[in-house]
Amino acid sequence: MKRKPMSRKASQKTFKKNTGVQRMNHLNPRAMRGGIRL
């Protein structure tokens, strides 16, 4: 799965989203594999 390079602003936005995903994964270890890469 290749990701398109993003502008800095966009990557910051998605980073915030992804930290939420990570936090959920700590509570739900079975979902870990998808983790940061969602």
From Swiss-Prot:
Localization: Virion; Host cytoplasm
Domain of life: Viruses
Keyword hit for DNA-binding: yes
Gene Ontology CC annotations of this record: host cell cytoplasm; viral capsid
Predominant location category: virion
GO terms for MF: DNA binding
Region (Disordered): 1-38
Family: Belongs to the microviridae J protein family.
Protein name: DNA binding protein VP8
Source organism per UniProt: Bdellovibrio phage phiMH2K
